[in-house]
Amino acid sequence: MSLRLVAADAEKEFAQILHADNAAITQITSWIHNNLDRIQENETERDALALRIRDRLAPIRQQYLDFLKRHPQHARARVAYGSFLTHIDHRQGAIDQWKQALKTDPKNAAALNNLAIHLGTIALQTRQTRGIQEAFRALDKAIQLNPKEPLYRHNFATLLCSFRQPAARYYKIKPQQITQKAIGEYDAAIKLSPKKFEYAADRAEAFLDLTPFPHTEAIRAWQATLAIAETPDERDWAYLQTAIAHFKGEQWKHVTSTLKRMTGEHHQALAGQLRRATEAKLDEPKP
């Protein structure tokens, strides 16, 4: 058998594993969604679902292991397997797979992106930032390799916003400049993917970190976000965040009028807190 045929067979098998992986994750997501109330309230139900998920993923994991044993230099398979391992909360295993992929293919932007985001997630969960510099380096390189991938731009901006102080030390600029740098990266992501609500919402939220708070610019950003909202929940989130921006800008009456535009129940707890805080401000005696 020729090397070309061997490679073609490997790609076909890898595609089948990816399909099985995606199908399993889709099914598990459905299980969680359909049983959310029960697993939140009942520990036995939660444990039973966890066992069901483990059993569903076990054969997929074995397929990856068998494939990588026969094709250890297949970088894309290692990237995919690393992502798979995040679903079973095997953090170090995922990191090891992405680093192994980068040894084989140092220009694999997907591996660099995944590594950076995972290191950032671990830092947020553990409140330890020792891996953040590696995350910055990885996303810097991913963007260099593929500057037109909006996901990398968005992820980099989010990483900067989440770790302003470490980023300021790493890039040797002030935290305020880090936020401005992040907004620039969000701008790049939005230019590449202008209808992505998440990108626009995260950009608008970043203005909260600027001092003095640019109220007008923040409101304009949320208006642009609202214009591309496609679901009632997205619209409610944009209204809630617009109200928060008005609150920070001390535009109390605009807070109340904006909150009245919300129609769903999902964010009403936060809206209620903001409404009460605004009423307290309005009741304060004027100097």
Q: Where do the PLM segments sit?
A:
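Short coil turns that delineate tetratricopeptide repeat
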Residues: P72, P106, P147, P194, ...
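Short coil/turn linking the two alpha-helices of tandem helical-hairpin repeats
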Residues: I17, N22-I25, T29-I32, L36-I39, ...
